[in-house]
UniProtKB/Swiss-Prot annotation:
Source species taxonomy: Eukaryota, Metazoa, Spiralia, Lophotrochozoa, Mollusca
Tissues/organs with expression: Expressed by the venom duct.
Domain notes for this protein: The cysteine framework is V (CC-CC).
UniProt family annotation: Belongs to the conotoxin T superfamily.
Name the UniProt record assigns to this protein: Conotoxin tx5f
Residues with Cysteine amide modification: 9
GO cellular component: extracellular region
Subcellular location(s) per record: Secreted
Annotated keywords: Amidation, Disulfide bond, Secreted, Toxin
Disulfide cysteine pairs (residue numbers): none
Keyword Secreted in record: yes
Amino acid sequence: CCPPVIWCC
């Protein structure tokens, strides 16, 4: 998705 942000998916 948009590392390091995992929950953005």
